[in-house]
From Swiss-Prot:
Pfam family, one: GCS2
Entry's family note: Belongs to the glutamate--cysteine ligase type 2 family. YbdK subfamily.
Protein known as: Putative glutamate--cysteine ligase 2
UniProt-listed Enzyme Commission number(s): 6.3.2.2
Species classification: Bacteria, Pseudomonadati, Pseudomonadota, Betaproteobacteria, Rhodocyclales
GO biological process: modified amino acid biosynthetic process
Organism: Azoarcus sp. (strain BH72)
Length: 375
């Protein structure tokens, strides 16, 4: 099967997807409530979409095509409110976070969907272990070569995005020592990691044709890359973030990505090279493990700094672009969080204590999400 044609979209338009946890309100473990949630949301007039995910204790919400941060936040909050109303009728809790803190993956059930059953048959237990929760952001691109430039340009900011969004310190009842343990589950898949180096759609199509000829892939859905082009939407999809604990933080992260994309597309400040990826996996690990305190190696000059310092430099770089997009306040809140060392992983660890159990932490996560609390 050949790669489909790239459908151009409005430059810098934005869309957001969030994978959410469904938990029982008696024990705050994951609960198989996706079917009931989808049944009760069917036919509602929503500002976006609600879909199933790999297992039946997950659900995905997605905005429509948005212009800016304010539009993203309005749509996400509308979806949140609709879901919360139905969840309360079902005695179900909804929360963000990249992992559930104490669920047993062996108890998960694959959602009844042909593709999910196929993936379970192909990947075995990895499919159930993939009960992790991420935020995906789509950025509109005017053409395929612009999309590939953006894929490689944004790859330099993967550590920044991991540290900002990290919300998965707990797994299987343990503190993992990671800021984002979710990405370790993603990295287990054979077609994960980073996209191949190609700067023209013809070169990218040649790569896809070779992979298709091996029988390994049949569509772009088969690639679990951190950033990938989505030709059917005319977008670049950034897939590396943990799901935040609030829609406000999710919208702010989307605004940061949009401002980075505008900076890259307007100023064209870099000429991507294959060698940029020499430090990609190192930087990715540092962000997952240590968050803001991790080491960032500049792909171009190989200088070292903390990820917090790299983030601060990026905020300065995109300042005018954030203003043009009307996102300076939202990005300013992220900037303040970096300066004070705060992210959702920090908040989650702060909830746990000698008198506070992991189920109580999940209950607090649900309170934040369902009550519409701020960043």
């Amino acid at each position: 099967m050949s790669l489909e044609a790239f459908s151009p979209s409005r430059a810098l338009s934005i869309g957001v997807e969030l994978e959410l946890q469904l938990v029982g309100t008696h024990d705050y473990d994951l609960v198989g409530a996706a079917d009931d949630m989808l049944r009760l949301t069917a036919g509602l007039d929503l500002p976006g979409d609600i879909k199933p995910e790999m297992t039946d204790s997950m659900i995905e919400i997605s905005t429509g095509v948005c212009d800016n941060h304010a539009m993203v936040l309005t749509q996400l909050d509308g979806l949140r409110a609709a879901l919360v109303d139905i969840a309360r009728r079902l005695n179900v809790g909804i929360c963000g976070g990249g992992t559930h803190g104490f669920q047993d993956w062996g108890e998960r059930r694959i959602f009844d969907n042909p593709r999910f059953h196929y993936l379970h048959e192909l990947y075995g237990y990895l499919a159930k272990q993939f009960t992790v929760f991420g935020q995906h952001v789509h950025i509109g691109c005017p053409g395929p070569d612009a999309a590939l430039y953006l894929v490689h340009g944004l790859s330099r900011y993967i550590p920044h995005l991991i540290a900002l969004s990290a919300s998965s310190p707990f797994l299987q009842g343990q503190d993992t020592g990671f800021q984002s343990s979710r990405l370790n589950a993603v990295f287990a898949f054979p077609l994960s990691g980073r996209a191949p180096f190609a700067l023209s759609w013809s070169d990218f199509g040649a790569y896809f044709d070779k992979m298709s000829a091996t029988g390994v892939v049949s569509s772009m859905k088969d690639f679990y890359w951190d950033i990938r082009p989505k030709p059917e939407y005319g977008t670049v999809e950034v897939r590396v973030m943990d799901t935040p604990l609030t829609v406000e933080r999710a919208a702010a992260l989307a605004a940061y990505i949009q401002a980075l994309a505008r900076y890259l597309m307007v100023e064209r400040p870099i000429q991507p090279r294959e060698d940029d990826y020499l430090v990609y996996t190192f930087n990715r690990f540092q962000a997952c493990r240590f968050g803001y305190a991790g080491t960032y190696v500049d792909p171009e000059n190989h200088t070292h700094c903390s990820i917090a310092e790299a983030l601060e430099a990026s905020f300065t770089r995109i300042e005018q672009h954030a203003i043009e997009l009307g996102a300076e306040a939202a990005i300013g809140r992220l900037r303040a969080d970096v300066a004070s060392g705060r992210n959702d992983a920090w908040w989650l660890r702060g909830q746990l204590g000698p008198q506070v159990t992991l189920p109580e932490v999940v209950m607090a996560q649900c309170r934040r999400w369902m009550n519409g609390e701020g960043m």
